[in-house]
Curated annotation (Swiss-Prot):
Sample GO molecular function, one term: transmembrane signaling receptor activity
Tissue: Highly expressed in the spleen, expressed by both B- and CD4+ and CD8+ T-cells, as well as non-T- and non-B-cells, including macrophages and neutrophils. Expressed at low levels, if any, in non-immune tissue.
Quaternary structure note: No direct interaction with the B-cell antigen receptor (BCR). Interacts with SYK; probably involved in BCR signaling. Interacts with ZAP70.
Glycosylation sites: N105, N118
Domain Ig-like V-type residue range list: 49-145
Residue(s) carrying Phosphotyrosine: Y215, Y226
Organism: Mus musculus (Mouse)
Cellular-component GO terms for this entry: cell surface; membrane; membrane raft; plasma membrane
Any single GO BP term: positive regulation of cytokine production
Protein name: NFAT activation molecule 1
Source organism superkingdom: Eukaryota
């Protein structure tokens, strides 16, 4: 019975292995596909800025790092090519890279120097590693300017705004001056009108009537005298000034003289 249980347990252990066995088997099989995957694998990494701006006639530096995971003692050729802003490839050349000491994965650093770059150097630069397969890095954008920063030119809108503001200021000043001049003219005209009316009223009593016949003058003389005196002062005859009374006496003397002349 015990032997049968042992045999059954062995069968069970064979059919259902312990939990550590699948993990051990997996670890044994793991290096096989990994070795196959790393065969010919090369990594290119930029160690400089992805976008660079420089002035003309100055040197531009940028670099990349190449990592060869194949663990093979080989120096893969590295090339650099340039494309312009329209995407056309301009040139391609091979560059030299330096190995890092003490690195097992044979890492190399590649430094590129563009001497006295001008505006034609503007574009995108790519690194290429040629081996069993061709590997290409991401592009480095380099913008070369032939002039320094200049402030924007005087815009037309700003000129129009300035002209409109100046015109409105001038019109405001002219309008204010015109209003002040008009007010002054109105005040002067009012004073002149008042002076003219007072002068006309003062000359009513001293104006001599036109030459008429003796009878007509005798009929209208007294009425005109009283009407003139009333218009000037608006008061009765007895309240007139001495000058007015003197004028009245003079008119009465004239009436008596005309009466004597008529009797003659």
């Amino acid at each position: 019975m015990e032997s049968w249980l042992l045999r059954r347990g062995a069968r069970v252990r064979c059919l259902h292995p312990p939990s550590w066995l699948p993990a051990w088997c997996f670890l044994c099989l793991l290096p096989v596909p990994q070795t196959l995957q790393l065969t010919g694998l090369v990594s290119l990494t930029h160690t400089s800025l992805p976008i660079m701006v420089s002035l003309a006639n100055t040197d531009v530096f940028f670099s990349c790092r190449i990592e060869d995971f194949t663990r093979l003692q080989r120096d893969l050729p590295v090339k650099l090519f340039h494309t312009d802003i329209h995407g056309r490839r301009r040139w391609e050349k091979q560059i030299n890279c330096q190995h890092r000491p003490g690195m097992e994965n044979h890492t190399r650093d590649c430094m590129v120097k563009l001497s006295q770059a001008n505006t034609s150097a503007t574009g995108i630069y790519y690194f290429i590693v040629e081996g069993e397969e061709t590997y290409q890095s991401d592009g480095v954008v380099i913008l070369v300017r032939d002039t320094v920063y200049q402030p924007p030119a005087f815009k037309v809108q700003e000129a129009l705004m300035l002209g409109f503001t100046s015109l409105m200021s001038v019109l405001g000043v002219l309008g204010t001056a015109l209003l002040l001049w008009k007010k002054k003219q109105i005040s002067v005209l009012g004073k002149h009108t008042a002076k003219t009316c007072s002068g006309l009223k003062s000359t009513v009593g001293t104006t001599k009537p036109p030459a008429e016949s003796v009878y007509t003058s005798l009929q209208r003389r007294e009425t005109e005298v009283y009407a003139c005196m009333k218009e000037e002062t608006g008061s009765p005859v007895f309240s007139q000034s001495p000058a007015t009374k003197e004028k009245l006496n003079r008119f009465e003397d004239d009436n008596e003289f005309n009466l004597v002349y008529e009797n003659l």
